Amino acid sequence: MGVATLPAGGLNWLAVWRRNYLAWKKAALASILGNLADPVIYLFGLGAGLGVMVGRVDGVSYTAFLAAGMIATSAMTAATFETIYAAFGRMQGQRTWEAMLYTQLTQGDIVVGEMAWAATKASLAGTGIGIVAAMLGYTHWLALLYALPVIAITGLAFASLGMVVTALAPSYDYFIFYQTLVITPMLFLSGAVFPVDQLPVAFQQIAAFLPLAHSIDLIRPTMLGQPIANVCLHIGVLCIYIVVPFLVSTALLRRRLMR
């Protein structure tokens, strides 16, 4: 991996973050509401419907159980959509990244800046769901504050994965495969909607490798005031999903942008 592929050092990536922020704030309200729509629909739809039939899960109401899962899910969704659709547009259609490379920025700076911006949007989305849950009495405000670092790390992990997909995709059409074959199954296998231990053993083993499952295992106990098991393991797995895809995407983008 060449030097130009890695971040140049310092805070150069902040220029990328700031550029994306300035473009986003023109339509900030619509963006925030869009990121909240799906998780809120899941929360009220499944919570009100299944909650009556299911009752309590792991000692708490099903809606409280679901709310914690939707916080992680909203962070995943926001980071994913930002790094595949929006970032791809900046790379392919607008050719913003190409223009950035004529400055002192490297591919690594661009990737770090895009990941940081996606994690910011993920944090806003996850916090938004958390605020709704706290207002409805399904968690405490202080618990939401404790969960913020995990929400941000979750955003970084899925942003890093999304950058790999963006680096590989020849067009927007290919993102549907990532959504339907990776993101949607992960939602149902990671314990967001129902406990992982209710799945067949084979699916439980798959869930053990999924970043969303580790995020939920950190966020849910925090939101519900329960002890957190295997904290170092969960954080370690999420960090792997941040670092390894980052290295892969920077290498792939070097070849793609230098053609």
UniProtKB/Swiss-Prot annotation:
GO terms for cellular component: ATP-binding cassette (ABC) transporter complex. Its main location: membrane. It is a multi-pass membrane protein. The keyword Isomerase does not apply. InterPro entries: ABC2_TM, ABC2_TM_bact-type, ABC_2_transport, ABC_transptNodJ, Nod_factor_ABC_transporter. It is found in: Cell inner membrane. The keyword Cell membrane applies. Keywords: Cell inner membrane, Cell membrane, Membrane, Nodulation, Plasmid, Transmembrane, Transmembrane helix, Transport. NCBIfam families: nodJ (TIGR01291). This is Nodulation protein J. It comes from Rhizobium leguminosarum bv. viciae. The gene is nodJ.
